[in-house]
C-alpha cells in the first residue's frame, strides 16, 4: 500500500483539544490522531463526563489495516470488534491520552483500570501471574497521584519491546520521557481495549476512530491498484 504521512484535523471534546499529531513520551515517532471521545456515567439521570480520551496511531497502522478494512463504512467498522482488535493488537505504535474533566485520584483510576483489564483476561482465559504482576506495577505507579481537571495520564503502547510507558502530564509541553515503563504486552493491549474494544468505556472515541479511519483508508491506494 502506498503511504504518506497521515494528516487529519484536530478534535475538541468539551474544553479539551486533541492536536492532529503527537510525539508520545518514550517514543521517537509522531503519531496521528485516530479519534477522540468522552468517558462518563449517568448519575441521578444526568450524564456526567469524567475524562476526554484521544487515541493516536503510528502511520504504519494505515498500511497494516488497509488490505482488510479498506472500503468499509464508518458504521461497518464501528460495529466490528475484529477491527478494533486489529488496532490494539497491531504491530504499530499507539498512544492514548486521557485528560481529566472531573478530579480523580490515582487510586480511583488504577482500581477501575484493574477491574476492566482483569475482567477481560479472565473472560478470555488468559489471566496469569504475569498479568497480575503487571497490574500491581500499574497500581503502584498511580497510587500516590492526584489528577485535577486538565491533567492527563498518557499511555505509550510500544511494540518492540512490547511495553507500556505511563506518563503523568500536568502542564506545559508534553514530556519527552515517561514516569514508569511496564514490560507487558498484555497490559498495553488491555488498556486500549478497555477504551475502544467490544465493551469499551468510551463509545464516542470508538465511533470517532471508526469514522476517521474509514475516511483515511478510503483515500489510500492499495499496492498494485491504479
Swiss-Prot record:
Gene3D superfamilies the record matches: 1.10.890.20, 3.50.70.10
Keywords linked to the UniProt accession: Flavonoid biosynthesis, Isomerase
Pathway(s): Secondary metabolite biosynthesis; flavonoid biosynthesis
Alphabetized Pfam families for the sequence: Chalcone (PF02431)
Protein name: Chalcone--flavanone isomerase
Catalysed transformations (reactions): a chalcone = a flavanone
InterPro entries the UniProt entry points to: CFI, Chalcone_isomerase, Chalcone_isomerase_3-sand, Chalcone_isomerase_bundle_sf, Chalcone_isomerase_sf
GO MF annotations in UniProt: chalcone isomerase activity
Disulfide bonds: none
Enzyme Commission number(s) of this protein: 5.5.1.6
Enzyme class: isomerase
Annotated site, Important for catalytic activity, chain positions: 109
Function: Catalyzes the intramolecular cyclization of bicyclic chalcones into tricyclic (S)-flavanones. Responsible for the isomerization of 4,2',4',6'-tetrahydroxychalcone (also termed chalcone) into naringenin.
Additional remarks: Part of the biosynthetic pathway for all classes of flavonoids, a large class of secondary plant metabolites, many of which are brightly colored.
Residues the record lists as binding substrate: 51, 116, 194
Family to which the UniProt record says this protein belongs: Belongs to the chalcone isomerase family.
Gene: CHI
GO biological process: flavonoid biosynthetic process
Amino acid at each position: 500500500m502506498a503511504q504518506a504521512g497521515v494528516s487529519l484535523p484536530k478534535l475538541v471534546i468539551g474544553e479539551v483539544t486533541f492536536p492532529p499529531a503527537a510525539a508520545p513520551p518514550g517514543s521517537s515517532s509522531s503519531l496521528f490522531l485516530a479519534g477522540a471521545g468522552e468517558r462518563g456515567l449517568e448519575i441521578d439521570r444526568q450524564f456526567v463526563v469524567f475524562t476526554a480520551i484521544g487515541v493516536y496511531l503510528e502511520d504504519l497502522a494505515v498500511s497494516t489495516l488497509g488490505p482488510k478494512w479498506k472500503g468499509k463504512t464508518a458504521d461497518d467498522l464501528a460495529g466490528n470488534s475484529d477491527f478494533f482488535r486489529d488496532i490494539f493488537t497491531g504491530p504499530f505504535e499507539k498512544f492514548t491520552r486521557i485528560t481529566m474533566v472531573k478530579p480523580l485520584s490515582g487510586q480511583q483510576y488504577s482500581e477501575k483500570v484493574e477491574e476492566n483489564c482483569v475482567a477481560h483476561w479472565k473472560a478470555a482465559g488468559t489471566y496469569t501471574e504475569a498479568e497480575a504482576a503487571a497490574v500491581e506495577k500499574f497500581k503502584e505507579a498511580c497510587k500516590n497521584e492526584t489528577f485535577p481537571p486538565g491533567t492527563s495520564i498518557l499511555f505509550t503502547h510500544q511494540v518492540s519491546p512490547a511495553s507500556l510507558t505511563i506518563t503523568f502530564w500536568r502542564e506545559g509541553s508534553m514530556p519527552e520521557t515517561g514516569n514508569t515503563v511496564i514490560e507487558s504486552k498484555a497490559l498495553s493491549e488491555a488498556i486500549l481495549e478497555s477504551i475502544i474494544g467490544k465493551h469499551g468505556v468510551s463509545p464516542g472515541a470508538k465511533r470517532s476512530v471508526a469514522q476517521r479511519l474509514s475516511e483515511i483508508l478510503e483515500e489510500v491506494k492499495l499496492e498494485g491498484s491504479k
